[in-house]
Amino acid sequence: MVNTGEIKNLEAIDIVKLLSVLPHRYPFLLIDRIIEIDGDRKAIGIKNVTVNEPHFVGHFPENPVMPGVLILEAMAQTAGAISLLALGRGKEDLVYLMTIDNAKFRKPVVPGDQMRIHVQLLKKRSEVRRFLCIAEVEGTRVSEAEISAMVVKS
């Protein structure tokens, strides 16, 4: 069988596979697994939010809330991972965030939450991709944004 570089309907991508694809590491690796994937068209990533994460020391000590910018980064990492996987590329290549549009934060994400990050490809042109991203906790939308990113060979 010829490898086209396209991944279709994989059941899950665990943390070991994510570490082989993404260059991010603790404390900036913000997805724990991808539970559903359909090539670079759509995926659902998981972020298990724990009180041990360093940003909770200062955001906010008495009432910890995951910073919105880190929710956006988790979305970008999920989109980046499926882009690299679909192209058959790994952490030697990079995905650069280009734009964030229409970002909305509807509810706080707190320690103990499991955030599901839905990403859907809206447009693809050469190495540039645009995704609709929706983050949910227990089925409730907590954030959404459209992001554009570029896959770059290192």
Curated annotation (Swiss-Prot):
One BP term from GO: lipid A biosynthetic process
Keyword annotations of the record: Cytoplasm, Lipid A biosynthesis, Lipid biosynthesis, Lipid metabolism, Lyase
Pfam families membership: FabA
Catalytic activity: a (3R)-hydroxyacyl-[ACP] = a (2E)-enoyl-[ACP] + H2O
EC number: 4.2.1.59
Compartmental location: Cytoplasm
Enzyme active site: H59
Cellular component per GO, a single term: membrane
Coiled-coil zones: none
Gene3D superfamilies: Hotdog Thioesterase
Single GO MF annotation: (3R)-hydroxyacyl-[acyl-carrier-protein] dehydratase activity
InterPro entries membership: FabA_FabZ, FabZ, HotDog_dom_sf
Functional description taken from the UniProt entry: Involved in unsaturated fatty acids biosynthesis. Catalyzes the dehydration of short chain beta-hydroxyacyl-ACPs and long chain saturated and unsaturated beta-hydroxyacyl-ACPs.
UniProt family annotation: Belongs to the thioester dehydratase family. FabZ subfamily.
Name of protein: 3-hydroxyacyl-[acyl-carrier-protein] dehydratase FabZ
Name of the gene encoding the protein in the UniProt record: fabZ
